[in-house]
């Protein structure tokens, strides 16, 4: 995609340059469904063959799970059933407890077509996996929060991270997480 965030930059820094050149010579970008905060995901459509497109979607774990029906597991594609969902949750919750942000990646192949791809195309995906990133708080965060508290200022945190990541970060900077309110708690209020 033309728009890169820090997670994209981290992924690209970890890519083998020769492999990237080989892949970029074989694959062509066909379209893009941009990120938005409602879907919390974005997709690119690429093609290696003229008659087949591949939609690759990345985003917040729950949003990717919501549009996935299968998962690649030990090299096989299997149904994304309750057992697999529990396994995924166990692993990703553990990563979140360590303060790691998790971005999920899913895909599907489609017959090539003319015209733009839409949100509706982000369905019946195969969860390919997830990427965990450490985004540690800045060294100046804890002292700044301590100074605010000493001045009688109450700090509230608003984040797009998971509840578990937010709790870990709050702990690291000496901030009592207190009562946590998540987006699904607020949605009915609007």
What annotation goes with each model-predicted range?
Residues 137-149:
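The conserved cystathionine-beta-synthase
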């Amino acid at each position: 995609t033309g728009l890169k965030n820090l997670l994209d930059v981290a992924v690209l820094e970890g890519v083998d340059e020769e492999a990237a050149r080989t892949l970029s010579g074989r694959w062509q970008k066909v379209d893009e469904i941009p990120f938005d905060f409602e879907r919390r995901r974005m997709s690119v459509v690429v093609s290696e063959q003229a008659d087949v497109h591949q939609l690759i979607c990345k985003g917040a774990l729950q949003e990717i799970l919501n549009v996935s029906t299968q998962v690649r597991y030990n090299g096989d594609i299997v149904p994304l059933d309750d057992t697999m969902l529990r396994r995924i949750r166990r692993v990703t919750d553990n990563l979140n407890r360590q303060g790691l942000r998790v971005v999920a990646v899913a895909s599907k192949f489609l017959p090539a077509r003319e015209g733009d791809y839409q949100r509706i195309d982000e369905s019946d995906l195969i969860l390919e996996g997830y990427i965990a990133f450490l985004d540690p708080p800045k060294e100046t965060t804890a002292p700044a929060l301590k100074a605010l508290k000493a001045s009688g200022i109450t700090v509230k945190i608003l984040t797009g991270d998971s509840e578990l990541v937010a709790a870990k970060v709050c702990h690291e900077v000496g901030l009592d997480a207190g009562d946590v309110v998540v987006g699904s708690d607020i949605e009915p209020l609007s």
